[in-house]
Amino acid sequence: MQRIILLLLIIFNLKSFSQTVKVVDFDTEIPLENVVIYNENKTIISHTNKEGKVNITEYLETAILSFNHIGYVEFEILKKDLKQVHYVVKLHKKSLQLAEVILSVSRGVEMKTRIAEQVSVVTASEINQLSPQTSADLLAVIPGIRVQKTQLGGGSPVIRGMEANRVLLVVDGVRMNNAIYRTGHLQNSITISPTVLERTEIIYGPSSVIYGSDALGGVINYFTKTPEINKEKKVNLTYLSRYSTANDEKTNHVDLELSLNKWASFTAISYADFGDLKMGKNRNHDFDDWGKVFQYSDNTNTFYNPVGVNNPNPNLQKNTGYNQLDLLQKFYIPLDKKSDITFNIQYSTSSDIPNFDNLAEVTSGKLRYAEAYYGPQNRFLASTNLHFNPDYDWLEKGSLIFAYQQIEESRIERRMSSLDRFYRYENVDVYSLNGDFSVALNKLKNRNLSYGFELTHNEVASKAFGKKIAVSGNQITGFTRDFVIQSRYPDGGSEYSSAALYTNYRQDLNSKSTLNTGIRFTSTFLKAKWIDNTFITLPDMDIDTENKAITATLGYIYKPVVQWQINALISSGFRSPNIDDIGKIRYKSGQVTVPNIYLKPEYAYNAELGIVRYFKNKTFQIDLNSYYTLLHNYIARGAFEINGQRTLVYDGVTAITQANINFNNAYIWGGTVGFSGKLIENLKTKGSLTYTKGKSYDKKLPLSSIPPIFGDVELNYTFQKFQTGINYRFNAAKKLADYNLEEGIDNIEQTPILVATGKYYGTPKWNTLNWNTHYLLSDKVSLSFKIDNIFDTHYKEFASSISAPGRNYIFSVLIKI
């Protein structure tokens, strides 16, 4: 009898010892990770794992447990009452605006209600719902951002009328912008797979106090997933598979998280294969042949054809497909209770990416290029991120990030019926060290000081050569000889470095207002050397420049009542010319860009006002952000002479010379109005409308990269495990008179031609209707189905060479084990 009683006691104790609660979303019943659970005096604190589970054995039966998660309403319950809800806690979403924590504005954690800057956040769950093919496609659905595409393997984000090297890209605290980030259009955002993103944050407008050079139009911060120490579950496996019909996309992704007692690991592999892209068939713009591909080149590395091939389906954009491989490896190691270190390795590579812009160019009815493609676009990053919380009087917490990046780019071209093939290769090594520190200056933590430094060093190697191919029939059998061609950047090597210090102060003046101010000093250094003067001789073939800049910001947040928030901001930014600005030699559309060794920095002075109005207990909001930016000494392409000459022979073609030049002043102004929130139970909506205007004061010409009015509206319905939504996207027309025709950045030649006048029309207006649905088969398996561009509309995004996808059916499955 004693043994039976003892056995029953053991069973009872085991049952008590293994008390586990599962926390899920009230609407979707999706398990919630990182929910914080604590008792009344917070002597015991726990967190849910990826399955939403947490062990609550150590809490007293009489304890009141509080369940807290960013984005959800706090929930309290007596531990002994959990049995009545079957140990399942369902949390209700609260207003997104109240919940948002911003990581990028001060390079640390800050509530959005204490930030004057306009900021957008996209979470991992939203990324899963959007299911974008690339990170560029992800940016295209964020309010206030347009994405230009020269080819399928690309995507150049435009923020507040600025793009390329006027927009700063950052991944895991490391700046991606390097010495050869160019003006015009930049495609590097695709080198980060959206499948590994934990969140993406966009800061709109000049942010040079925290981020330094290039942060004029805004900052795009990518945060990749990081492993955690998890006592509940040691292994987490995720698999994603997606198929899209418009370009025969096949994406497969797998990631594995291992959590041990003293360290954790996250490994991710993503592979995407994209076929040729089909454009829409319905031409509401009434230009019957605009964008159609009637002929294409079937030339390859080994196959020679002196003429183009007729395309049996002109709506299929031949020579657009490519594939891409992305790898991510992270190790997280807690060193002690006050410090931890994260090792981060990223690698992205691709196949050759066809340059559709060139391959589709037709001259006198014939294709201009037989071969035009980018070689594999390789990006490697290795970083070490040390976090520490010493809690000193002058340093409460901080981080040090040391990073190394290697970027490889190449361009291979051969004109139709020519035997001369041109090769240009660029290699960039980037070293950086960032230190970011913060401290609360009082016990209430309403006075905060942050400060830090940044050191970067870029080394650029550029080489170029030509080879004459040997042909037998239609086969390329080898090469007959080599010949000299002009390199894209200085062939003697070049370097670009920066050093900066900053400080930022934030104070809650009272319960209704917050003041923020900051200042940064940055110094940049550039060295470049040209050796070969076969084609071009500069006034100085060996240059050494240094530029200095002080930037500042002043922000004020005022909340007169609970329903209103007013943000005012004055800020400045700058961009120091890099190697691409000063030293690039490049041909396009009859013009060749040549070096200008006398180029100086450009500056931006910005004023903006933001207003937020909340409704229905902050479950719905309307917001307005307006701004005016003055560009001083701004850099743009213009007519330029080399040794008194306005022409130059480039790859055997005589072209008119131009260069990046400093002009006096220009302005950009505009704004975005948006709304988001709950209409009724289970039904949510959001939308935005963006207007941008830019013009030079001295030349009285429109600025490049200024998109027409654009916006979107969407409705989303959620019921338990089912979610569905519709999205309407629209874009106004941009007329010829609103284009800058001097620079050639906006690709006016990619717009339709009016038959009556023979002039370019500009970008026609367009709109698309899109539908998506998601269903949770279980807490481990979810299915998604989308139809983009339901009416199969033909259109091109502003300044794009490639037509947008036509009707696109997208199927995906997500499995978490």
Predicted feature descriptions by range:
Residues 36-40, 68-72, 84-128, 164:
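Short, acidic, small-residue-rich periplasmic hinge/interaction motif at the N-terminus
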Residues 85-90, 135-138, 155-158, 169-170, ...:
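N-terminal periplasmic accessory domains that precede
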Residues 176-206:
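Short acidic/polar hinge/loop motifs at secondary-structure boundaries
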Residues 245, 369-391, 490-494, 541-559, ...:
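Outer-membrane beta-barrel signature, preferentially recognizing the C-terminal barrel domain
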Residues 247-273, 284-351, 378, 443, ...:
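Transmembrane beta-barrel wall of Gram-negative outer-membrane proteins
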Residues 334-348, 377-533, 549, 557-560, ...:
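Face-selective signature of the C-terminal outer-membrane beta-barrel domain
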Residues 349-351, 406-410, 523-534, 544, ...:
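Surface-exposed extracellular loop regions of Gram-negative outer-membrane beta-barrel proteins
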Residues 511, 523-524, 627-630, 640-643, ...:
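Gram-negative outer-membrane beta-barrel transporters
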